[in-house]
């Protein structure tokens, strides 16, 4: 039947322990997992795409089936170019579900061969977002429990 290939898209600015938890869990299910790093045109990023990709590569180095790439355009189109049959999305709370359901429905309309898989976050990360990490760090708050160590150092360096 071939490899089970999935895409997990996000801006990952920066990658958090919540993101990493979803990536690690998805990597157990899929043979190949593409982490696609996106630019969100409505946000000014703290890190460049290249910096984000490098951090993700470092924190996922223990996952041999994970590949990190940048992507633009529609995620469903990117997934198709990679031979993926699934898009993985993490859900923190019910509030995430409505937005994600709309995107999943649109993706299904655009390409019925690609399924969306929702993965509930570990409850200890249910409050966690990249935006929150940046806000806490901006005011010299401790983010060491929220992000991997190399990300913590990189974020702290941005706010010195």
Curated annotation (Swiss-Prot):
Entry's EC annotation: 2.7.7.3
Cofactors: Mg(2+)
GO CC aspect terms: cytoplasm
Keyword terms of this UniProt record: ATP-binding, Coenzyme A biosynthesis, Cytoplasm, Magnesium, Nucleotide-binding, Nucleotidyltransferase, Transferase
Positions bound to ATP: 11-12, 19, 90-92, 100, 125-131
Pfam families given in the database record: CTP_transf_like
GO molecular function annotations of the record: ATP binding; pantetheine-phosphate adenylyltransferase activity
Domain of life: Bacteria
Localization, UniProt: Cytoplasm
Sequence positions that bind substrate: 11, 43, 75, 89
UniProt site positions, description: Transition state stabilizer: 19
Reactions performed catalytically: (R)-4'-phosphopantetheine + ATP + H(+) = 3'-dephospho-CoA + diphosphate
InterPro entries: Cyt_trans-like (IPR004821), PPAT (IPR001980), Rossmann-like_a/b/a_fold (IPR014729)
Disulfide topology: none
Pathway: Cofactor biosynthesis; coenzyme A biosynthesis; CoA from (R)-pantothenate: step 4/5
Biological processes, Gene Ontology terms: coenzyme A biosynthetic process
Protein family (similarity comment): Belongs to the bacterial CoaD family.
Cited function: Reversibly transfers an adenylyl group from ATP to 4'-phosphopantetheine, yielding dephospho-CoA (dPCoA) and pyrophosphate.
Subunit record text: Homohexamer.
Protein name: Phosphopantetheine adenylyltransferase
């Amino acid at each position: 039947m071939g490899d089970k290939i999935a895409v997990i898209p996000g801006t990952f600015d920066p990658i958090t322990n919540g993101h990493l938890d979803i990536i690690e869990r998805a990597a157990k299910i899929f043979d190949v997992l593409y982490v696609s790093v996106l630019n969100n045109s409505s946000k000014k990023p703290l890190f460049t795409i290249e910096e984000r990709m490098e951090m993700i590569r470092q924190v996922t180095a223990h996952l041999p089936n994970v590949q990190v790439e940048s992507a633009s355009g529609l995620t469903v189109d990117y997934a198709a170019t990679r031979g993926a049959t699934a898009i993985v999305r993490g859900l923190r709370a019910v509030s995430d579900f409505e937005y994600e359901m709309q995107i999943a429905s649109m993706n299904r309309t655009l390409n019925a061969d690609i399924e969306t898989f929702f993965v509930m976050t570990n409850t200890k990360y249910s409050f966690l977002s990249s935006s929150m990490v940046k806000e806490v760090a901006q005011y010299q708050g401790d983010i060491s429990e929220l992000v991997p160590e190399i990300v913590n150092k990189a974020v702290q360096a941005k706010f010195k």
